[in-house]
Amino acid sequence: MASEPASLRDRVRELFALERDVLVLSVAMFAFSLGFQMASRYLGEYMVALGASAVVVGLYGTFSNVISAIYPYPGGAISDRIGSRYALTMFGFLSAVGFGVWLLAPAFGALAVPLIFVGLVFAQAWKSFGLGATFAIVKQSVPPARLAEGFASTETFRRTAFLVGPLLAAAVFAAFATTDTGSMADAQVVDAFVYVLALAVVFALLGTLAQHVLYDSGDDDFGKAFEGISQVADDLRNLPPELRPLLIGDTLVRFANGMVYVFFVLVVTRFLGVGLSTTLPVVGTIDLSPQAYFGVLLAIEMAVALLTMIPVAKLTRRVGLKPVVALGFAVYAIFPALLIAAPADAGVLAALFAFSGLRFAGLPAHKALIVGPAEQGAGGRVTGSYYLVRNVVVIPSAALGGVLYGGLALPGVGTFAGSPPLAFGAATVVGLLGTGYFLVFGEEFAAVNG
């Protein structure tokens, strides 16, 4: 009888493909993602409240894309060389510093918006620098045929934080709102978001500490030393051929998402201006500003993602990875058009964000399709190479989205009158092109059925 509890734990761990290192990684991802999601999804609103225009918000998104393009490859190479434990510890600490810069930005007056850009250099370190390290840990810990389930375990922990984080942010915004369901004043947005960022700093430090203390680096799979730009070129030339159709389709879909991602919060809080007023048993009447309701919408999105991610990951063992990845791409593509055309109704927005959660169901399969063909010991570099190409192409997407969203006036040239519907409609067209390309030319990873 004494062995029964351990056996039950083993079965639960097996269900989620949670080897020890993957479990530790998942716990760290939960803590860090809790803070990052609370902060990053509201940054467009924060910047506008600090005085930024839509074009500047778009430039912020493009700067984020630059960092996403630059960080993953050296991050993967560092992980392959020094091991995932020390790499992720360093990246996590840098991210906490970035959150702190965002927190202090309003105190610097006219420099507040530029400091948002400075803070991003640090804040995105764990997310982008650590990408190769997180992929490599799963790659070396989980059998090839179960990669989708291994990634599903880390994604489930991370997405659980993505559910809890926005609810915490919503509670903070609700505490600072002075109107029932009307949009908050800019000063109120700034005051509330400073507290959100303080929580983000705490969670980032906790995640970094947990990962460093609990992770067993004895099984780290070390690669060769980084050989400079020539190695980057070699890795790109040697990218497994199965990845090329996925890379092209994925790049188009992510370009589309990048055009509008930083503007989702502005559509809810300022373009549609949708809050929530409802009565619940025991609790009574609840009135949420659009800023607070956006956090609830993000939680709804993540709830759907969590409910579907593990079952869909297991489904890949029957239907393969490609159909699941294509489903995620399709949801990415059509969501912008659906959102911008939605009526200013809280229930409709809740349904749309629930639909958007389906895009995350394909992420574990997508990651398995990326890292599956990689040789052991090179998982970090293959992942970094893939994301390097994708993220370089996606760099201008947010700036383009900002121009289409808010328009642009150039002295001596003229004025381009953009609009939110124009930006979101164009994003859907680009996303559908990427989805169609992958459906026609995408390949399956043979180990799934092997």
What are these regions (language model features)?
Residues 7-67, 242-297:
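Helix-loop boundary and gating motifs at the non-cytosolic
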Residues 71-83, 173, 307-320, 405:
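Helix-to-loop junctions at the C-terminal end of transmembrane segments
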Residues 112-130, 347-361:
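Hydrophobic core of transmembrane alpha-helices in multi-pass small-molecule transporters
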Residues 119-160:
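Cytoplasmic helix-loop-helix junction between adjacent transmembrane helices
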Residues 174-201, 405-431:
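A membrane-interface helix-boundary motif in multi-pass transporters
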Residues 201-221, 434-442:
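C-terminal membrane-cytosol helix-exit motif in multi-pass small-molecule transporters
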